[in-house]
Amino acid sequence: MRLLILTCLVAVALARPKLPLRYPERLQNPSESSEPIPLESREEYMNGMNRQRNILREKQTDEIKDTRNESTQNCVVAEPEKMESSISSSSEEMSLSKCAEQFCRLNEYNQLQLQAAHAQEQIRRMNENSHVQVPFQQLNQLAAYPYAVWYYPQIMQYVPFPPFSDISNPTAHENYEKNNVMLQW
């Protein structure tokens, strides 16, 4: 039993993380690393992100408007060219006009599909941005290595019972002298 306890203690001691040697100034000055980040820097970061988002949104709406204008101009240009050409048979004229109309409708449909996809992408981006955390996170000596939290928890929880029982004293009833029962170890 003692050998088992000894081996467990040795295993825990060997598995214990080494102290961080890269940043000795953090170990010497733990109060500096746990200082709260000023609110102004967070607001500046969020304002910068909002400005970038607005600029991107404006660029994308301009691109959509440009493509919409180009598609309508293509349809308008295609119709006069069709009229100017002299085609002898009326069946060819009707087939060309139907093709031009179908092309314009298909182009408008594609533009609507692009707008819908763009709107869905914007909604997805806004949802992602609402879940983005501020990149300024506090660093302290325990956060330098993530496995150190297992050994050094920051909040000690109240434990209502002792984690280890006293092995040296056996557990017995008050009147154990009168009973012929073996003691529990």
From Swiss-Prot:
InterPro entries linked to this entry: Alpha-s1_casein (IPR026999), Casein_CS (IPR031305)
GO cellular component: extracellular region; extracellular space
Modified residues (Phosphoserine): S31, S33, S41, S71, S85, S86, S88, S89, S90, S91
Localization per record: Secreted
Coiled coil feature spans: none
Free-text tissue specificity from the UniProt record: Mammary gland specific. Secreted in milk.
Signal sequence range: 1-15
Plastid found in the keyword field: no
Further facts: In milk, the alpha s1- and beta-caseins precipitate in presence of calcium (so-called calcium-sensitive caseins). Kappa-casein prevents the precipitation of the other caseins by calcium through the formation of large stable colloidal particles termed micelles.
PANTHER family given in the database record: ALPHA-S1-CASEIN
Subunit composition and interactions: Heteromultimers of alpha-s1 casein and kappa-casein; disulfide-linked.
Listed name of the protein: Alpha-S1-casein
Encoding gene per record: CSN1S1
